[in-house]
């Protein structure tokens, strides 16, 4: 792209963005800076030959961390340095739900948000600490969340909400903002990824307020990761070693081959995402042999370091272009990820944590796992059943009939026992009775127009069912 056209595009964009009164001056300048970086064609690819596997000093094995201090006073002092931040910008639309994803019921009538609040309440009660909860909303979830958090008014935790940035979608043809062309509804805008957490925390005034209260670290996680509970060993390690940033990573399985990984690159620890990998090395990137770990998006970051880097405008994370279409108009969303910020912080590390700290619920197949006898809930934490000897969870594949939460729940009188299950595939018009037990490899595929009802109390082990006759 010729520089002149890039310059013209940018000046046209600036004058259009200046007229968008729905967003703040901070958001306008943040957006213009992001687009300018994108147009300058900053190199996104890495030089493959410079990639090194991180050592145990850089990616610390969890089992080498020092034990948590014994005394409850020491633990209280540790916890009083902590803030928990949940990324709450996503909607439950992919699972057929309206409103924020965090209000989907996970188990025992409790939502993601209920479980998070119970966990922190439990910590604060046990140790007399004051760990606040921050929710970073997007413009899509803000209004609903404000109403939802009222139900926690009587809890012993402070709950704060703030909004991540709101940026205009760019029309690909002329590089002008969609809202300035009359799309003033929500479709004209987008939240620019969780990388915007850092400036948003600062612009909201929350960052300075937390620092003035003596808070030192923020533990950030997706609100749908049920494994992301406060870990005192990790917090203790970071405080003792003055690490400004920590990313929790965990060993890859074949399901995670596209996940970002940590590398050592030119003397710093860096996140490597599949989008940055040159085409000829994508196969190598996906191999579990060379890149053994992936990013859980559980992050621990020092608050003063965030302040220093935001004020210096130093957090220039890799830009992720996300093309979309709105009513036939091709648009572009430029996004950044919080994990990519790792290379800007001093003494940044990864910690290789057990898989139990990564339990995301992205689809109803995940919901089946966490609602089953594979897990129990204790003090808001989802604990895996020790009766399951296989460290990996069964693979679950559910057809489109189960995609929406309401349909999924309607098709199970009760969630089957799956402690001894290896894999399950269910497609078509299938209904489950109560007390069903599934073991080994089970496939239930109802052909079009055929209804399959699994009777109450059925035990199905290593079986393929293609119709009622197979039961």
UniProtKB/Swiss-Prot annotation:
Q: Which domain of life is it from?
A: Eukaryota
Return the CDD domains for the record.
UGPase_euk
For molecular function, the Gene Ontology terms on record are: UTP:glucose-1-phosphate uridylyltransferase activity
Q: Which UniProt keyword terms apply here?
A: Cytoplasm, Nucleotidyltransferase, Transferase
The main location is: cytoplasm
The record's annotation in Pfam families points to: UDPGP
| Residues annotated to bind UTP | 87-90, 101, 164, 193, 224, 362
Name the reaction it catalyses: alpha-D-glucose 1-phosphate + UTP + H(+) = UDP-alpha-D-glucose + diphosphate
Q: What is this enzyme's EC?
A: 2.7.7.9
- Of which family is this protein a member? Belongs to the UDPGP type 1 family.
- Can you say what this protein is called? UTP--glucose-1-phosphate uridylyltransferase
User: Origin organism of this chain?
Assistant: Astragalus penduliflorus (Mountain lentil)
| Gene of this entry | UGP
């Amino acid at each position: 792209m010729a520089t002149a056209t890039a310059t013209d595009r940018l000046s046209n964009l600036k004058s259009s963005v200046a007229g968008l009164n729905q967003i703040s001056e901070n958001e306008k300048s943040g957006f213009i800076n992001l687009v300018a970086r994108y147009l300058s064609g900053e190199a996104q690819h890495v030089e493959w030959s410079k990639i090194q596997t991180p050592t145990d000093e850089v990616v610390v094995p969890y089992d080498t961390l020092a034990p948590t201090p014994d005394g409850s006073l020491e633990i209280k002092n540790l916890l009083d340095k902590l803030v928990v931040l949940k990324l709450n910008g996503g909607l439950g639309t992919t699972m057929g739900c309206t409103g924020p994803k965090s209000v989907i019921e996970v188990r025992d009538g409790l939502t993601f948000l209920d479980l998070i609040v119970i966990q922190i309440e439990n910590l604060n009660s046990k140790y007399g600490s004051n760990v606040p909860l921050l929710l970073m909303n997007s413009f899509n979830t803000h209004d609903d969340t404000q109403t939802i958090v009222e139900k926690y008014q009587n809890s012993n935790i402070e709950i704060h909400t703030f909004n991540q940035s709101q940026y205009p979608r760019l029309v690909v043809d002329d590089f002008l903002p969609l809202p300035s062309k009359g799309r003033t509804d929500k479709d004209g805008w987008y939240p620019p990824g969780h990388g915007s957490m850092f400036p948003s925390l600062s612009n909201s005034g929350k960052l300075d307020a937390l620092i003035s209260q003596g808070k030192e670290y923020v533990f950030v996680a997706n609100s749908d990761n049920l494994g992301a509970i406060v870990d005192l060993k990790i917090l203790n390690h970071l405080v003792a070693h003055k690490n400004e940033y920590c990313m929790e990573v965990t060993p890859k399985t074949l399901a995670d081959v596209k996940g970002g990984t940590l590398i050592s690159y030119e003397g710093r620890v860096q996140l490597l995402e599949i989008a940055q990998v040159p085409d000829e090395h994508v196969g190598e990137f996906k191999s579990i042999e060379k890149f053994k770990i992936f990013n859980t998006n559980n992050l621990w970051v020092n608050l003063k370091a965030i302040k220093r880097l935001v004020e210096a405008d130093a957090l220039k994370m890799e830009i992720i272009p996300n093309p979309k279409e709105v009513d036939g108009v091709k648009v572009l969303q430029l996004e950044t990820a919080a994990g990519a910020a790792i290379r800007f912080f001093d003494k940044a590390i990864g910690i290789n944590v057990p898989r139990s700290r990564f339990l995301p619920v992205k689809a109803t197949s995940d919901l089946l796992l966490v609602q089953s006898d594979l897990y129990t809930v204790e003090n808001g934490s989802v604990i895996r059943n020790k009766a399951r000897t296989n460290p990996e969870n069964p693979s679950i594949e559910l057809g489109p009939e189960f995609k929406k939460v309401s349909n999924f729940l309607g098709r199970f009188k009760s969630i089957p026992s799956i402690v001894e299950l290896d894999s399950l595939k269910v497609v078509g018009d299938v209904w489950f009775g109560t007390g069903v037990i599934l073991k080994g490899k089970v496939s239930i595929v109802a052909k079009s127009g055929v209804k399959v009802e699994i009777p109450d109390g059925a035990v199905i082990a290593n079986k393929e069912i293609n119709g009622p006759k197979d039961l």
